[in-house]
Amino acid sequence: RDAASVIFNLPDYHVIDAIDLPLGGRRVIVQADTIGDGCPDCGVVSERVHAWCRQRVRDVPHAGRVEVIVRKPRLVCSERACSRITFTQTTAELPLRARCTTRLRRAILEAVIDHGRPVAGVAEGFGVAWWTTQAVVNAAAVVLPDVDDLHVKHLGVDEHRYRRVRWFRDPEAGWRRVEPWMTTLVNVASGQVLGVVDGRDSAAVEGWLNARSQAWRDRIAVVAIDPSAAFKKAITTSLPHAKISVDPFHLVQLANLCLTRVRQRLVQEHHQRRGRKVDPAWAHRTLLLRGYDTLSARARHRLEEVFASDDPTGELGAAWGVKEGLRLVLKAPTLDAAKAARTRLEGWVNASDTDETTKLWDTLNAWWPAVEVFITSRVTNARTEAANTAIKHIKRTGRGYR
């Protein structure tokens, strides 16, 4: 290919001319590399040119505004029995009646769907109308497969809050509280959002699962959830054969909350006030929540200074050890290693002898079967959390965050 065609890089086309426009921008004239196409009626391939026509199409910007003109051949149908006499050549980049190149449509979809940009901003950036951009998005939504046709083996369920609580007045029932919670169901393998339901109770999740076909539900092997009794009830009711995997992020979050509550309680008991920056434990409160294996030598030294100077009873250090012990349980490579780490953790919990660590230990025991499933399958809710973040981003982009 010549240099201009290489730079323009429109698949199956080459540049035959390019000029500067008087009011700015450039006009690029392209033509297909090969001449010939099948008749849309009979399918017979023809290479006989009847006439040439020119069509202006939209394409992705190239270092500024570019006006793309396509030189198209109008071919003569070679089949005498066909009712169509002539037809215009089509390609993968310019299908029949297309006004935009295929790569422009792909770029629009990537900007709107993958990056969550507003339709109006994408239309302005690519120099097309809002209606054109929205039509591309609508066309992509139409071809999305039905949920029941997808082969989902690992399912992720998680809730997210999208606004504050609202009260609406029902003429028949009076004031009604509307919870700002929604539950997202995601294919853990691909990250594709399968459904979004109102609320975060078991009835909402059960209703969505029961609406699926029996064959679809039978294929579900593992469901990843956070430590939620409502989600657990919905899964055991609608998917009794599926195993439940508890998300490790939420367990570590509970361990960090346990440590934070111990720190806050100790400050109140010893100083009768809230923590201040003069207190080493408060000043290094985020350091206490970090994993010990991720700390540098300098950070570990600061951590030792916190325990030496601001932990007279040793309860803070004991709670920190329980938090790290739980992390070791979740990081265990095998089930036997996890059980051994759990036994060590039990000793640390008994030694700490605080209400906060005992409550954390009871939670771990209550969800231990789900922890075992996580250790053996490593199915987490990471993609579900990512989907929730994307949903919130789309709502904010659409000015729907109020």
Predicted region positions:
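Short, conserved DNA-binding cores of transcription-related domains
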Residues: 1-84
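Residues immediately flanking
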Residues: 32, 79, 159, 188, ...
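RNase H-like nuclease fold core
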Residues: 47, 132, 136-222, 229-234
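Extended interfacial segments that mediate partner engagement and assembly in macromolecular machines
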Residues: 68-75, 83-157, 166-167
